[in-house]
Amino acid sequence: ILRFCLWFMGISMAFPSLSQTMLVTNGNTSSRIILKENNQISWTAANLLQTFIQKVTSCKLPVVISQTPRKGDILIGGQSPAEVTEDGFSISTQDGILKISGKENGVVYGVVTLLEQYLGIDYWGENEYSLTPSKTVNLPLINKVENPGFRYRQTQCYAIHTDSIYKWWNRLEEPNEVFAAGYWVHTFDKLLPSSIYGKEHPEYYSYFKGKRHPGKASQWCLSNPEVFEIVAQRVDSIFKANPDKHIMSVSQNDGNYTNCTCDACKAIDDYEGALSGSIITFLNKLAARFPDKEFSTLAYLYTMNPPKHVKPMPNVNIMLCDIDCDREVTLTENASGKEFVKAMEGWSKITNNIFVWDYGINFDNYLAPFPNFHILQDNIRLFKKNHATMHFSQIAGSRGGDFAELRAYLVSKLMWNPEVNVDSLMQHFLHGYYGEAAPYLYQYIKIMEGALIGSGQRLWIYDSPVSHKYGMLKPALMRRYNHLFDLAEKAVAAEPDFLKRVQRARLPIQYSELEIARTETEKDLVDINKKLDLFEERVKEFQVPTLNERSNSPVDYCKLYRERYMPQKERSLALGAKVTYLIPPTGKYAALGKNALVDGLFGGATFVDSWIGWEGTDGAFVIDLGETKEIQSVETDFLHQIGAWILFPLKVVYSYAEDGEHYTHWKTIDLLEERTGEVKFRGVKAESAEPIKTRYVKVEVTGTKECPTWHYGVGHPSWFFIDEVIIK
């Protein structure tokens, strides 16, 4: 065998045409792209191949249908080898003919692999790619079969929606391509709208805390047979209207512990030892009614843990979500992760049909550093090991998000092949996308990873730069990061494309500097204004659309920063005053609230700094100015962040007294309900045309106490938060 191999290699080198398929030679070609099937996938593959061969060689290969191939032709489609699975492909060169076949989208991914591995083309981001022009394209002997690590692969990057090639090149899919009629997660209210059934049939919805809770965000009474029949009819009509789809999601609305606890539902869940019991029982009935269809349902928050007895039917897909896990180390290395892993291992014992939704994102601060590159591969390997066949790696993929392009590139590669060399891929991307700046950015990434782990601070999906100001973002490290970015910008100063990419990658450090600065009592106002102006200039230049999941604009942030966080000309008379609570804040906020309401520091969009909260109750406190003073206004600043169940209160009442006992009513202010998803601040102010002499100011707040029917915490305690009381 060895003698034969050496003989064949010698013959191949002496007669290269025996081992090569020649597509273009010295700028000339007679090759054709032949489609075995005249369908959209084949045409997508052909157009992609034609486009990039033309970009490399300036030769445009014709595309023809169902013709007999000859030497030098490219055959797309046809029968795939038996070992090819969903989205997998085969590439072979035989008798001078290049053959690419695949299942589902496989022929497109085969073309991408050919262009990457044999023509040396890299696709980095939105209409951003690298290639080396050549007048000759000769392919070696190829016999390759590749199958994806996951049959469905999804992530987030702005380029998916702005560049028609990007998604194909990264071998990604989107829910609307797979799931019927947009029925993908949190579908209960779409299938059984509370606006239609809630008033007349509250029994269709969750029972807890002594009553039914119909509402847009409520869950179903899964033991109610009428609910099942209505939903089954809806499912039937949806699939009939979408005959090309075979999967849809029947899954709980967003929110936690809003499940039904009626006697029948509770009996199922108690027997199963998990709140997923009733939903899997329901889904199995649906799967049996429609055996040729597939149903995806969430194992999310209260349904994360698997049932003890009932097993999901093969056509029930478990969408398992690790939303509560911290991200500073792998899932097997911290307590929150271990809890999830235990649940995942439990599911993997009873089903092979698992979809893992992994959260590598900071929902509250897309532009904050999120150094989790070191955990990506181990976590994805873990998912695959535990029978995950579908995977959504959710990242901050919006324009300006922390290394959005690199992050999407890496998770896409890992979802296709969990065994790739991640460090090599990272360095390859950095050099290709940032040029000579790459070594400095690589150092920045690695130093921050080490600093995060060394700090012992958690990294989570509602994080804030302020949480890390004594850890990975402490002053000495921030100076080092900025020095590395200075070197990176200098290295590519003469190359505008690379320079802009480096400047965009710097935004998270600039944003972090501003966020940390607003929490400091001593401020270098000249420096802050300079940094704020530059940040605003850059987010406009790079068209950064949003700071967070709630769609708050970075341009609005800059405006708000100047109004809210920069020192005002007139000082509050309440600064440093004594605060006495009549109805104290909840939990840890009682201690934090001793000074926070009168320290002159306004809180940010997250509630990790400066905010004081009350849960499920009203609030009341007295501010002692220390002596009688003349005042004309009092204003209390509130936070609205529905994702954290933080709502504006219903009412604020102000009164005052000179002796601290006999109070005079000043003003009662009723607040309008706010339902927007955006994070908002609202100052509730009482004013007097004439000065009021007083020492004590009482603030009484009537909270919503309970999340309303439209909120996904329906029926559970709501919060209100105050960061500052201003008296002038």
Segments predicted by a language model, with ranges:
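Structured mid-domain segments that build the active-site/substrate or prosthetic-cofactor binding neighborhood
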Residues: 226-229, 338-437, 443
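Aromatic, loop-rich ligand-recognition surfaces of beta-strand-rich domains
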Residues: 603-665, 680-728
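Feature activates predominantly on carbohydrate-active enzymes
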Residues: 29-30, 38-41, 45-48, 52, ...
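Short, well-ordered secondary-structure micro-motifs within conserved domains or adaptor modules
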Residues: 62-85
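Substrate-binding cleft/loops of secretory-pathway carbohydrate-active enzymes
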Residues: 296-324, 367-374, 400-408
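Catalytic domains of carbohydrate-active enzymes that cleave complex glycans
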Residues: 414-594
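Glycoside hydrolase catalytic-domain groove-lining segments
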Residues: 306-313, 320-362
